[in-house]
């Protein structure tokens, strides 16, 4: 509730005098609950999100609880580190990098390719074989989307160069950078709040319109969910949709029909929203959307944890490809 009120106060400065008077009158007559109801309506208006993002730096996505972004280009053979401060991406350093000898996207174990996409860093390793330099950051490959695409392999790291000085022209699929820079990064970043975005060719900046469409879309989807509007809710799912456990769209529809038929009242709150572009070789615009979901249903079921979506945009509307 406090977050929502703060969220509304930030938006307050963009309201007309008449809208402010109306909000104050609603508060006077109905209290905080009335204000919440009014502010919730703004979340369902794309123009709100367009205005919200207008002055923010969103070239690598929209992040509420990420501090650093690694941006890699396989074509340019480089890796850049950006720090996110006050919704601006500040370049910390850019260095040449070595990628897998197979220039394509990674598909199977042992194909010597560096994966393309968006990946969290999951661990920091030290005391490795000298081949990997002083340390390595472990990426989340294969992520949820990769696994559902039947991609295999593991052990994709950002690591250093051999300590014996025998530098190679390519890696087995990892990203390798010079040891001094890697050691510097170890001191500067919190890997748990760092994401790696790897592009197959030139870096394509995320569009504000796409990000506004996604933010608007997930809140309309949420509203349909809260109000048991099955048709609207299901309209956000692509025909190619696959749930984390392999359930495809036809069975998912039937499952949700049974769930929505209970007509339970529920509350659903989203926070800590992170939206990253998800590059690919096929050129289709995809995004990874991750946030904290706080779900409470009348029947007693509760969930508070991470929701992960992979989405695309079709005809100006998000379509969910993968969900967990």
Regions found by a protein language model. Name each.
Residues 4-13:
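Sec-dependent N-terminal signal peptides
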Residues 177:
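A conserved hydrophobic position in a structured secondary element of the catalytic/binding core
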Residues 17-116, 120-131, 136-154, 161-172, ...:
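N-terminal pre-domains immediately preceding structured catalytic cores
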């Amino acid at each position: 509730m406090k977050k929502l009120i703060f969220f509304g106060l930030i938006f307050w400065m963009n309201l007309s005098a008449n809208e402010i008077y109306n909000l104050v009158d609603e508060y006077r007559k109905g209290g905080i609950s009335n204000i919440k109801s009014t502010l919730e309506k703004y979340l369902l208006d794309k123009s709100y999100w367009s205005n919200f993002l207008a002055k923010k730096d969103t070239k690598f996505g929209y992040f509420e609880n990420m501090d650093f972004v690694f941006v890699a280009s396989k074509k340019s053979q480089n890796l850049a580190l950006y720090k996110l401060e006050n919704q601006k991406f500040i370049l910390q350093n850019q260095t040449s990098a070595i990628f897998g000898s197979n220039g394509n996207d990674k598909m199977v174990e042992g194909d010597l390719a560096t994966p393309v996409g968006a990946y969290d860093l999951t661990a920091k390793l030290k005391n490795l074989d000298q081949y990997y330099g002083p340390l390595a950051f472990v990426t989340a490959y294969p992520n949820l989307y990769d696994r559902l695409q039947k991609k295999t392999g593991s052990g994709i790291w950002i690591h250093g160069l051999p300590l014996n000085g025998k530098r190679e022209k390519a890696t087995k699929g990892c990203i390798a950078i010079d040891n001094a820079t890697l050691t510097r990064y170890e001191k500067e970043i919190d890997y748990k709040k760092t994401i790696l975005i790897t592009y197959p060719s030139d870096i394509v900046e995320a569009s504000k319109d796409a990000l506004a469409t996604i933010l608007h879309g997930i809140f309309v989807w949420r509203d349909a969910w809260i109000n048991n509007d099955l048709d609207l809710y299901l309209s956000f799912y692509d025909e190619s949709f696959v749930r984390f456990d392999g359930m495809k769209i036809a069975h998912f529809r039937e499952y949700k029909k049974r769930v929505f038929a209970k007509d339970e009242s529920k509350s659903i709150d989203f926070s800590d929203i992170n939206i990253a572009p998800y590059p690919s070789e096929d050129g289709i615009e995809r995004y990874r959307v991750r946030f904290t979901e706080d779900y409470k249903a009348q029947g007693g079921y509760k969930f508070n944890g991470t929701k992960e979506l992979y989405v695309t945009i079709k005809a100006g509307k998000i379509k969910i490809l993968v969900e967990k």
